[in-house]
């Protein structure tokens, strides 16, 4: 394996260009899986939101460096921060869906997943006026046991998913998944 400028060369024949992608999950501290047993969705409104101010700071940094990213946004955040959605889009960034309520796919069924993701997609598309093409599952929770979610995403009109990691982990990952598309 050899790195040459903007590409990798493997042996004599296999070569591919290096593509760097920056993606950001737009969620607040109380949404994370580590707090799921302590702070439930009905309690989220009791906590001060930090996601808006932190994301604005991040947008300023990206703008100074002329860097574009994909922001996978929770529908819950989009409902409460519509100006943030607009600012992300106006900065030339892509907006993807991170679902509505940051629920691990394995904790629900297909019907609940479809409802959550459809709700978020509708909110984001209404606010942006553009089609939301990408999706990332909360806590990367598409696993070998929840691959049915990919079919649902296709049925909802998503063009790509960014939820699968080729790693061993207690909550996420598909160890034998390919590292490259």
Predicted regions and their residues:
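Intrinsic disorder/low-complexity segments
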Residues: 1-15
């Amino acid at each position: 394996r050899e790195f040459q400028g903007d590409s990798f060369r493997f042996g004599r024949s296999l070569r591919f260009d290096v593509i760097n992608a920056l993606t950001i999950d737009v969620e607040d501290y109380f949404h994370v899986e580590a707090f799921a047993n302590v702070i439930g969705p009905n309690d989220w409104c009791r906590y001060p939101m930090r996601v808006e101010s932190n994301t604005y700071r991040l947008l300023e940094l990206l703008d100074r460096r002329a860097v574009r990213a994909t922001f996978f946004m929770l529908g819950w955040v989009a409902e409460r921060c519509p100006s943030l959605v607009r600012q992300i889009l106006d900065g030339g960034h892509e907006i993807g869906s991170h679902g509505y309520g940051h629920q691990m796919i394995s904790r629900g069924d297909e019907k609940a997943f479809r409802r959550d993701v459809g709700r978020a997609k509708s909110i984001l598309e209404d606010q942006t006026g553009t089609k939301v093409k990408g999706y990332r599952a909360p806590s990367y929770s598409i696993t070998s046991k929840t691959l049915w979610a990919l079919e649902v995403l296709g049925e909802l009109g998503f063009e790509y998913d960014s939820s699968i990691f080729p790693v061993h982990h207690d909550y996420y990952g598909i160890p034998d998944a390919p590292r490259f598309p």
